[in-house]
UniProtKB/Swiss-Prot annotation:
The name this protein goes by in its record: Elongation factor G, mitochondrial
Subcellular location: Mitochondrion
Presence of the UniProt keyword Protein biosynthesis in the record: yes
Keyword check for Transit peptide: yes
Source species of the chain: Debaryomyces hansenii (strain ATCC 36239 / CBS 767 / BCRC 21394 / JCM 1990 / NBRC 0083 / IGC 2968) (Yeast)
Amino acid sequence: MSKFLRGISSISSASLKARASNFGVFHGVCSARNLHQSRLCLNVSKIPETYEEEKEIIDDINSKLPEKDILSSTRLRNIGVSAHIDSGKTTFTERVLFYTGRIKAIHEVRGRDAVGATMDHMDLEREKGITIQSAATFCSWDKDNKDYHFNLIDTPGHIDFTIEVERALRVLDGAVLVVCAVAGVQSQTVTVDRQMRRYNIPRVTFINKMDRMGSDPFRAIEQVNLKLKTPAAAIQVPIGAESELKGVVNIIDRVALYNEGSQGEEIRADTNIPEDLKDLVEEKRALLIETLADVDEEIADVYLEGEEPSVEQIKAAIRRATIARRFTPVLMGSALANKGVQNVLDAVVDYLPQPNEILNTGLDVSTEEEKRVNLIPSSAAPFVGLAFKLEEGKYGQLTYIRVYQGKLKKGSYMNHLKSGKKVKVSRLVRMHSNDMEDVDEVGAGEICATFGIDCASGDTFIGQNSEQQIAMSSMFVPEAVISLSIAPKAKDNGSFSKAMNRFQKEDPTFRVKYDAESKETIISGMGELHLEIYVERMKREYGIDCITGKPQVAYREAITAPTSFDYTHKKQSGGSGQYARVVGEMKPLDGENKFSQHIVGGKIPEKFLFACSKGFDDSLEKGPLIGHRVLGAHMHINDGQTHVVDSSELSFRTATHGAFKQAFLNAQPVILEPIMSVEISAPNEFQGTVVGLVNKIGGMIMETVNGQDEFTVTAECSLNSMFGFSTSLRACTQGKGEFTLEFNKYAQCAPHLQKQLIAEHEKKLQTKK
C-alpha cells in the first residue's frame, strides 16, 4: 500500500485510492432523494474484503439511481488498449476506429504507410513507429441493434512512457490486453498486468498476430494463466493458421465467423463449423466451462450437477467473472490482416463493465476527519472530476477530465480543490486523437477535455456549490532511474524554462532540478529514450537546441549497520551565536526513510524538534558518499541540549544535518544501484552470442524461452551496464535483436564500483574548490 500512496495527490496525505479495492472502499448509504442535494450521506462502514461485499455496495447505489442514469451508463464503456511494445495496440485501435465508422480509411504505423496511424498524432510517434503519449478518442458500436458509446485510450507499450499507461488505467473501467500470438506474454505484458491490478481493471484479452509464422494462441493463453496468474480461457478457436487465417469459431454458440470484404469489414456467420475443427471446439468449450466453474458459483452448480450450461448462462458467467477480476476471456485474430477485431468490440459490450458497475470512492477533506465517500454515478449528484492528463494545445493547456459524479456544462463553473479557485468551463470537447469535437455537457462516467485551466495532472475538481470537498487520489508515479545535465546552446530567452515547466506539468515522471554545486539543470526520467524524446521535443516545439551531458544513473546511498550519534553544533561570531546538541541512534530500514524522536523532560522544545525533522529531510537529498539520495535510514533522537540565547530552529536543523552525516559514515554505508529486468529477443542462431553478451555485462539470466524461430532471454542487469547495450546487441545479432528494460529493484553495487564512484565524487568536489 505504501508503494501506491507515494503517488497520492497532494490534496491530503491521508488520501486513499479512489477505485474500490482491497486498499479501501467504504460503504455509504444514500437515499435517492438526496442525489440532487449537494451533501452526500456518509454512513461509513468496514472495507469490503471480497468482491461480493464490493458488489453489495454497487447494487445498493444502483438501486437508488434514476432510470435515466442507469440507461446512459448501460450504453457506455470506458476502455484502454494496453500491451507489450510492438504487440499491435495501435494497429488494433486503428481497425476499431475504422469498423466503428470513426475514420474512413485505415492507416498503418511507420514503415507501411506515409500517413501514419490516427492515434499516433505526434510527428515523433510516426517517425519512430512507437506510441509516446496515450491518445483518447470516442466511437460508437452497434450490437444487437443497440448503439454503444466507447471512450477509448490507446497507450504506449514502451516502459519509458509507463506513466501514460498509469494515467489511462486510473480513469478507465476496463481494458483490452493485446498479446502477441508468437512472442506470448512478454516483460511489458507483465508490467501492464501489474498496473491493471493496481487500479482493479477487468480485461478481455486479444491474441493478435495470428497470421504470423509460429503463432500459437493456446501457448499464449497458457502463459496468461501461468505468468500473469489470471484464470483465462479461449472463447474462440482460429479457422486456418498463419497466412491461411480466415476467421474464428465462437465456441460458446458454436458459430464460425469469417471476415470478408477488402478490409475485413463484412462478417459472415456460419453455423456449419469446419469439420476438422469440431473436436477442437468441443475440447476448448469444455475447458472454458471448467475454468468458469472454478471462478463462478452459478456455473459451478450447473457443472457439478453434470448439466451443460446454456449459451446465456455461459455468457452471464463470463461477464460476472470478468468484472469481478477473476477471469479474462480470450479472443484471437490479426489486426493487420483485418481479422477478429469486431468480435473484440462485441466482447467489450458483453463482458466489460459499464461505469455504474465499478465502485469509485473519494475522500471528503472538508472536515478534519476526512471521511471516505462512495461516488454516485448520477448526473443529478454534485460534480466530481479528476484531471488525469495535460497537453499544450494551440488554444492553451488542454486538460483531460474523467467525470465520476454529476455533470459538467459548457459555460458553468467548477472549483479547483487544491487551490480553492473558481474556474469557468469556457469550452468543452470530446477528443479524437489530436482533433476535437465541441459538446455542451458531459455526464457521470464520461471523459472530456477543456481549455484554459491552470492545474496539474491528478488534481480534483468539484461543483461550485458542493458542500463536500471530495478529493480523488492521483495515479502511482514511479521513481526516475536516469538523469542527465541539459543546457540550451544559445542564450535562453525564457523558452527553455517555459518548456521545462510545461513538460513537468504534463508528465509526473519527468523531473527537473537545478544543481547549485555544478550550476547545471538536471533532468531525470524513466530511461534514455524518455529523456531523448523530451530533448527532441525542445528542438521541435520550442526551437531550442540543447547540449546534454552523459546519462547518469540514479544511485542511492544506504547504511547496513546501526550506530549512535552525539553531535553538537556551535558557532560564535559576535552577538547571538548558534548552539544545538542532538543525541540518538540511526539504523537501517527496509524501504522508506523514517525520522522519530522521544525526548523526556522537554530538553528539546517542540519547535526545535520540527527543525530536526526538516534537517533530516534535507540530509536525505544528498548523501555523504556521492551526493545521491539516501534510501532506508531511520534516525531517532532521544536526547539533546539547548542554550537559552544561542539555540534556534536553524541551529537544530544544522545540528541534525551534521549528526546525520557523522552517523551515516559510521554505519557501514553502501551505494545502491538500480537493477533492471531485461528481456532480449533474437533469432535462434544468435542465442549463444546473446547469452555471452549478457554474461559479459555481468547480468544474471533468470529465464530462457525457445520459440520456433526466436528465443527470449530474461535477465537482471545493472542499469550502469546497459549504456551502449543496444549498439552491442545490434552488432552481435546483425540488427535483428530487440530488448526492453524495466526498473526492478535497488541492490548494493560491487565494492570496486563503490570505490570508483566515491573517488570520482571527491575529485569533482576538489575541482570546484
